[in-house]
Amino acid sequence: MNPFHASCWNTSAELLNKSWNKEFAYQTASVVDTVILPSMIGIICSTGLVGNILIVFTIIRSRKKTVPDIYICNLAVADLVHIVGMPFLIHQWARGGEWVFGGPLCTIITSLDTCNQFACSAIMTVMSVDRYFALVQPFRLTRWRTRYKTIRINLGLWAASFILALPVWVYSKVIKFKDGVESCAFDLTSPDDVLWYTLYLTITTFFFPLPLILVCYILILCYTWEMYQQNKDARCCNPSVPKQRVMKLTKMVLVLVVVFILSAAPYHVIQLVNLQMEQPTLAFYVGYYLSICLSYASSSINPFLYILLSGNFQKRLPQIQRRATEKEINNMGNTLKSHF
């Protein structure tokens, strides 16, 4: 539920009316906004909801939770927060940009969505740093890499995300535009306010964490290559070479980071491009909505990446299902005994 969406919606009709074929352009925009986009977001919402609930349930029910499990569980929770706002976004799109759920819910949904952006970026960054220490310097900061400390770190990241999202809690509200449509938007009337807020959100959620994430993985790749060369020269197994399980976890986190970059980069680039545009073009309008779909799609893709890339999840799912079945059978047995 991005605050920029409402302004984009209201400029789209005017923009398309100036295109080659007014009637065709208007009909196309209407179909895209009220049918195609809501349908796409609806599919993403359904898939992501099931997948992320499955991941959270699997980790919570696991007897042995690792440090990466805690980070992945928090990412899944963040994705669920992201998905919670999707039905409201679908409804607003389907009604031509009109918000009918009232001001308080507009503020809550918009603020939680922004908070999720901060949380995802922060968790992804800290998880990348954790992978660096687990792989390259496993004996450093060991007292911080415990399950208890990791839970506290993640709680701190969530608290910081709520604080960073305070401007959205204050300024997001239902706004009535010139065409009479009331939309849930971010009430920034000054161009300077729009500029500073866009830079603030883009830098803190993408351009600041991105270099940290990339540095961590460049160092990991350099270390892995160095260990490979040492093994090749010595023609033996070096005990300092990372274990296969650590490498699998690192590979999984690396793929998650790549998905994070590919899904978030288009949206943030378009936000910066918008600052330089006096009148959005049709290409910008289409690109903006595609970037929205990409950002939401990552919430659906992530849980399946956890399952496909992590051997632990593939082993845990049948075990948890078996334990749940056994528990259900025992409960049925106890119920039958109580009746006889």
UniProtKB/Swiss-Prot annotation:
Stretches assigned to the Cytoplasmic side: 61-69, 130-154, 222-252, 310-340
UniProt protein name: Melanin-concentrating hormone receptor 2
Known tissue expression: Specifically expressed in the brain, with highest levels in cerebral cortex, hippocampus and amygdala. No expression detected in the cerebellum, thalamus or hypothalamus.
Keyword check for Nucleotide-binding: no
GO molecular function: G protein-coupled peptide receptor activity
Entry's transmembrane regions: 40-60, 70-90, 105-129, 155-175, 201-221, 253-273, 289-309
Gene (name only): MCHR2
Membrane topology: Multi-pass membrane protein
